Each structure stands twice: as C-alpha cells, then as structure tokens.
Amino acid sequence: FIDAFFTSVSATCVTGLAAVDTSTFFSQKGQFVIMMLMKLGGLNIVSFAYLAAFLNRAGFGLKQDEIIEDFVTKGSFFNAKKMLLKVFTLSILIEVVGGALIYLLITPDMPFKSEGDKVFFSIFHSISAFNNGGFSTVEGGMFAPFLQKAFIIHIVVAALILLGAFGFTVLFDLFTPSLLRDRLKHPWKRPHMSTILAVRTHLILIGVTVILYLIAEWNNTLGNQNFVESTITAMFQAISVRSAGLNTVDIHSLAVGTIFLMIIMMFIGGNTFSTAGGIKTSTFALICINTYSIIRGKKNVEVLGRTIPTDDVLKSTTVLVTFGGGMLICTYLLTLTETHILAMSDRSFIDLLFEEISAFSTCGYSTGITGMMSDSGKGILIFSMFVGRLGTLSIIFVFARKILTTNYSYPEEHIMVG
C-alpha cells in the first residue's frame, strides 16, 4: 500500500519519484491513473483554489482574491478569475501538440506492440513532460536503450518541460494574440517585468548548467557521444533537473560535481505559477540582486528600470529560509531512518540529500535509492513532496483570515550582523 500511495502522491505533486518501476508494477490502467494525477497536479494550486471557489457557495472573500492576484502579479495583465479556463485550454493544446510530435517521431524499430501503445506512450510522455511529472511508461524512462539515441524526441520533450517550467503567466504574457498585436503596433510596450526577469534568469541558469555539465561529464557519461549529441544531452538534463525529473543518463553514474550542481538547480526550480518546484527563479533573482545592491551600498533593489517593493524582497528571503529550513530538517530525519542506506559501500550522505531535495523541489531525480528506503523514509519524502508542491501560496492562503495589522511600531535599534 505504501508504494502505491507514494506513487499517487508523487504523481499528484508532479514529482516523479517512484518506489517501484512504473512500467512493470502498474498495468496500463494504473499508468492511465498516474497520467491523470499528473495532469491534475500540473494545473497548479491556484487553479484548484479557484475551482474550489466555484464549487463552494461561499466562494472567496476579498482578502483571498487579493492574495491570489498578488501571487500571480500585481497589476496583472489578465483577470485572475479567467485564469482557470485559460490554464485548462493552454495546457491541453500544448499537450496535444507535444503528443502528436512524439508520435510522429516514433520509428518502426521501437518496441511497441500496437498503434494504441504508441499513442498512449506519446500522450503519457507529453503530459509527463509539460506538467514536469517525471514518470515514464517504459523501463528506464528516457534512458531506455531504444530512446537513448532518439535525440529529436529528447528535444521535443525538453521543449515541453521548458514550457511547463516557464509557467502559465509567462506563456500568457508572451504569446496571447491580443498582447502580441498590441506590441507590434506599439514597439515601446514590452512584456511584464516579472516575465522578463523570469525568462532571463531561467535561460541563464540553463546556459550555465549546460556548460558546467559538459565540463564535468565530457569524459564520463558523455564519453561515447559526439559534440552535438553531448550538447543535446547536457541541455536535456539542464532543463529537466529544475523540476521535471526525466533523464537521458544514469543519474547514479554522474560525477559528484554534477550531482552537486543538480542539487543547486533543483533547489532553485522553475518560474512562479508553473508546474516546477523549488524556491523559484524570481526568488533566486531577487535574492541575488538584493545581495548585489547591499554590496554596492544601494538602499533600493532595482531591476530593469524599476524599484522592487521591500515587501517582495522580504518575501523572497522568507521563501529561501522556510524552504531551505524545511529541506534541512527532512534531510536530518532521513539520516536517522535510513542508516541501512548510509551503511552501503556504494552510497553516501549525498544520496540522501539528493533524494530529499528532489522530493522537496518536486523534481523527481534519484540516484536509485527510492525503492531501498524504509516506510518511515518514504513517509518523510511524501511529506516533503506535499509541502514542496503546495509552497508558500497555500500557507499564506490558510492563514489569510488571521493576518492582523497594527497601527504602531517599536523604536528601531541596530544589531551586529556578520
């Protein structure tokens, strides 16, 4: 039961960690259930919040509605109450197109028994990729022998992962027809600042990861590939590691430096209001920019010709501290429950740390120890996946009615720092 429950939580939280082999343990009906759970989980907590409101006569109060508007972006470029329909429509469109492309790229030598199996494989992996689910219907996933050299499929899957990690607000801002027409007529108009910051940060992190991955793995996992193939492999891992969990290499065979790089990237995650986990790219960017501003002696945090409100900077710090603190506590608990793994000659603490960050960041990468973990360890990972998927929005939402404001403040006094 614990393995089935673990899988259902992993699918709903679009993580991808699995205590059993999805391709052999579950029938096609079971795999269909996993696919639907990934689809529902990928719609994002905000969409479910509005769906709950539609089904609840009481609906949302002004405070809750304001919080959701604030989470998406203040001065949003679309009405938040139209968000649900837009998210459904866009996600289905992308998944159908992605599934069709994967289907067309399947070659006759691939071991599918029927056309139905090809269609199911295509749809499953399209949904898994776009929703950053990390599950696969074939043994070994994207690292299966018949998929290792299917580089065009790798590119399609990576593109789906990237779109999912960009997030719905970014996609709406960049590709809504009315906004595109408006920008063509008025060239001075540009995408929302949050969109520009998120996309730039995301692409920079991908570029840095690709370069460092190539350096670390050139004579290791990339040893039997040419430059183009190696670049595609590095790009796939650089995109997937931020939350998708699909891999085209054996994670356990990676160099320690690459594992550490992946830990950092999983911790950062994808964009806000996306299918990705982690602290989010905007949080990471604000923390870096704030640090730079402090070093330069600036009083304000400035980005792209705009001053960032102090509240947003404080929120980013809060996300970093709570996310990092929760992850460290859960990692410590795993060292207490998984002593049998630490006692293995080919395993170490970094395997547990990698597994925990993968769960907390809803990434789904594993060095192969998920199935070895005790029921207590799996319980810790289940908790981590739940918390990582819900994130700060749900916590704020739960306590929204209890938020109090005061009309006074205490005198300031400086303390020693550093």
How would you label these PLM feature ranges?
Residues 1-418:
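Membrane-proximal intracellular helices of multi-pass ion channels
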